[in-house]
């Protein structure tokens, strides 16, 4: 098993996080959609992290590192009402199925014990994500909604009590 470490990410980490996010999201697009590229706006040019990690006081980005190499990341939103949000989580396909995601989720829960519940959204077509969040992390699907920015159906999940 690899020795993963988690660090708060900053602006200097955006190029490497963007590289890994691009590889991970494009792999999902090929696997589930038969398309060469696919991800949220700005996922492949750094704009995603500028917009969602740096521009808001409530959001905190993390990088997942093994042997001094960034292999994944995630962004959490810690909100005043205690209903916090997992904005994104991604792992380089070369490191998937090695317990990186579950370890990252355990870290998140341990780091934010004041959280009453966690919410997240993931694309309907992202079957591996559904399994991961439901079976590995204990989330429950609570509905579906259309993502206005991307125009795709998103499954909404929750863990904990509201």
Specify the residue positions occupied by each region the protein language model found.
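A short, internal acetyl-CoA/4′-phosphopantetheine-binding micro-motif in the GNAT/acyltransferase core
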Residues: 89-96, 122-124
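Conserved acetyl-CoA-binding loop-helix of GNAT-fold acetyltransferases
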Residues: 91, 97-110, 135
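Conserved active-site tyrosine of GNAT-family acetyltransferases
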Residues: 133-134, 139
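Conserved beta-strand in the GNAT
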Residues: 61-63, 69-78, 85, 90
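Conserved GNAT acetyl-CoA-binding A-motif
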Residues: 111-124
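A conserved beta-turn-beta hairpin within the catalytic core of GNAT-like acetyltransferases
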Residues: 78-87, 96, 114, 151-153
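Conserved GNAT-fold acetyl-CoA-binding loop/helix
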Residues: 25-50, 59
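Conserved N-terminal entry element of GNAT/NAT acetyltransferase domains
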Residues: 1-12
């Amino acid at each position: 098993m690899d020795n993963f470490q988690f660090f708060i990410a900053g602006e200097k980490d955006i190029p490497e996080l963007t590289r890994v996010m691009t590889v991970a999201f494009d792999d999902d697009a090929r696997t589930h959609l038969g398309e060469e590229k696919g991800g949220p706006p700005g996922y492949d040019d750094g704009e995603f992290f500028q917009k969602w990690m740096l521009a808001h006081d409530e959001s905190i980005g993390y990088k997942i590192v093994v042997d001094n190499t960034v292999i994944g990341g995630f962004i959490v939103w810690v909100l005043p009402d205690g209903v916090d949000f997992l904005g994104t989580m991604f792992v380089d396909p070369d490191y998937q199925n090695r317990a990186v995601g579950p370890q990252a989720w355990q870290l998140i829960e341990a780091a934010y014990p004041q959280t009453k519940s966690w919410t997240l959204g993931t694309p309907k077509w992202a079957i591996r994500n559904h399994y991961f969040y439901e079976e590995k992390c204990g989330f429950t699907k609570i509905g579906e909604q259309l993502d206005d920015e991307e125009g795709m159906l998103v499954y909404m999940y929750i863990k904990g009590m509201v």
